[in-house]
């Protein structure tokens, strides 16, 4: 998960090379923040799994399809780790109507950060984004504002239990 401080220079070069080598990173401006992954005190037996400089030179051409998927995942996770944080503004509005209290929540993305890389990586590999929810954006509101005949709808949803552990997820949870 972390690298040591003596690896910062080579990792910065590696990240620059990966941005050029990965097709889904074309046109993406990445300001790598290596301080997020560089911590000598958290490296115990081995530093984080990183692609090699040799891979940046050769690319995906010599890899089998399953190896390409794995390498793409490793590269994407490294780029997500050094990318800007995902920032959003969350708004909760509380309304009272006819003696009942209603709540509306909205979220506006300020900086997509690492989520942009994850989204592009998933799209390139053909995966669906499991966490993708439509962003609920609230209109501009002011305290004490009144509404005439607002449109309303009731939505009913069911919760889902957590997914069952597989052998891999059980080991990683332990």
Predicted regions mapped to residue ranges:
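Core catalytic DNA strand-manipulation module of type IA topoisomerases
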Residues: 1-174
């Amino acid at each position: 998960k972390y690298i040591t401080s003596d690896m910062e220079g080579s990792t910065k070069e590696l990240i620059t090379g990966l941005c050029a080598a990965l097709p889904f990173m074309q046109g993406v401006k990445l300001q790598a923040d290596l301080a997020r992954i560089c911590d000598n005190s958290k490296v115990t037996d081995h530093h984080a799994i990183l692609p090699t400089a040799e891979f940046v030179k050769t690319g995906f051409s010599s890899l089998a399809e399953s190896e390409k998927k794995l390498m793409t995942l490793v590269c994407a996770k490294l780029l997500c780790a050094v990318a800007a944080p995902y920032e959003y503004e969350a708004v909760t509005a509380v309304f009272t109507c006819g003696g009942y209290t209603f709540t509306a929540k909205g979220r506006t993305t300020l900086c997509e950060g690492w989520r942009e890389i994850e989204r592009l990586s998933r799209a390139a590999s053909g995966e669906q984004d499991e966490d993708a929810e439509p962003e609920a954006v609230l209109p501009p509101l002011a305290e004490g504002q009144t509404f005439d005949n607002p449109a309303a709808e009731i939505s009913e949803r069911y919760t889902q239990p957590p997914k069952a552990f597989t052998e891999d997820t059980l080991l990683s949870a332990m």
